[in-house]
Structure formats: C-alpha cells, structure tokens
Amino acid sequence: MELILDQVSHSYGDIEVLSDISLSVGSGEIVCIVGPSGCGKSTLLRILGGLEKPDAGAALIAGDPPADSFNPLTYVFQDFALLPWRTVEGNISLVLEDHSVRKDKARAIIADVLARTKLSEFANAWPRQLSGGMKQRVAIARALSVNPAVMLMDEPLSALDSQTRELLMDDLIELWGQVGFSACYITHNLAEAVRLGHRIVMLSRRPGKIREIVDIDIPLAERINYPAETATIQRRLWEAMRDEARAADRELSDVA
C-alpha cells in the first residue's frame, strides 16, 4: 500500500502552512520529514493519516493493506499515551478489542509484538515501572499489533535521552529488518533522519514546500559502518536548514 500527497496545500485561517506538497510513502519504505519549526511537518502527517482535509490537493491511498491488517494506518506519537491502570499487555490488547479478535489469536498477536519489541519479560509490568524508552517500545508494539500498512510517527524519540534514543533507533532498524514496515517519520533531529530514512524530505520555512529530497542507498543496518558518508548527508541537510533560518531572519529584518 502506498500513501500519496498530490499537490497538497493547507492554511489555518490566514496562515499558509503547506504549499504544493507532492510526495509518496511506498511499501517497505521509511520516509523522514525534516524542516524548521513551524514548517508544517505535523500538519503533513495529519493530512496523510486522514485526520485533516487539505485546502487544496489530495491525500490518496494506492493499493491494499495486508489481508490480516486490522488498521491500515496507525500513529506513534512523542507522548506514549499509555493507560496507567493497564499493564503492558493490557495497553497493547486495547487496540485489538474493537476488532472482534478471538482471545487465542489476540494472545498470539500480543506475544509476537512483545517479542519483536523486546518486551516479553515486561508483559505484566505497569507503566509507572517503565523507563521512557520502555514506554515508547510499548507504544510501538501497540501500533504493530494491528499489522498496519503504514506507521505515521511524529517525533517518537524526541522526549528521550540521547543514549535511549540510540538504542531505540537500533531497535527500529532491527524491527524493520524483520517486518519491513512502511513509515512516514517526522523528526527535527537530522542524525535520526539519516540513520532511519530511506528518503529524507526537507521542507522549507513556512509555508512548507519541498526544498530537497535526499535518497540514501546505504542499507539501514549498515549505515553505522559508513560514518563519513552519513556525516556528509547530514552536513548537506544542516546547511540547507541554516540557509532557511538565515532567509527567515532576513525577512524579519525587512519587515522591521
């Protein structure tokens, strides 16, 4: 299944947030969206997921989700949003309860996603007993339990310390190697984007337009072995971000 934005523009009142955005998220592909604060990254994700309708253009779905998918699109946010009165297992089972899944099948699904996210030993733990990184693992396991065609991820690691972020990036890469999931991944962290993205889409300052698209051919699991190449890509993105910031400063000076 493929998600497509076709010449999408969107405004909030008189403020134009996105302008003429066309991009796609293909099967088995992680597309990272980066750009200055306020450039419309989260708005773009909401439009992709059908939570908002664009003022112009269209958000389209091409193809079919997996036959055993309970929900073709699912979100992972910065906020883990775990119910404190449910265990880890109970938080994951919550999203299956509206799908009339047989109890034995639900148990098998939960056991599988717990194993894939390295949470099997914590099935009966309460959210208050978990670190931030463990809570985000639960959120990812919950998203995977419905076997989505595409995960929409809005800064899922930004609330975590740098060491935990590194560990979870390793886990996501390992998980992608097992499952080959598709994702649109919003981040302000360029190192994160270069580590996780098959494609990186940089938006300009508001109104967000596609300034640059960078394809990275190095396999995800091997990028740690190519520090010079990934550093070059990151520097290229950083220079583009810096140019955007300088242009914004000049515009403010002209107004003043």
Residue positions per predicted region:
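Conserved ABC ATPase signature
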Residues: 126-130, 134
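A short, proline-enriched helix->beta-strand linker immediately N-terminal to the Walker B motif
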Residues: 145-149
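The feature captures the beta-strand-to-loop junction immediately N-terminal to the Walker
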Residues: 34-36
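Short coil-to-helix segment of the ABC ATPase nucleotide-binding domain corresponding to the Q-loop/switch region
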Residues: 86-93
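Helix-to-loop junction immediately C-terminal to a conserved catalytic motif
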Residues: 49
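Conserved ABC transporter NBD signature motif
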Residues: 57-68
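Conserved ABC ATPase "signature" region
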Residues: 104-122, 173-174
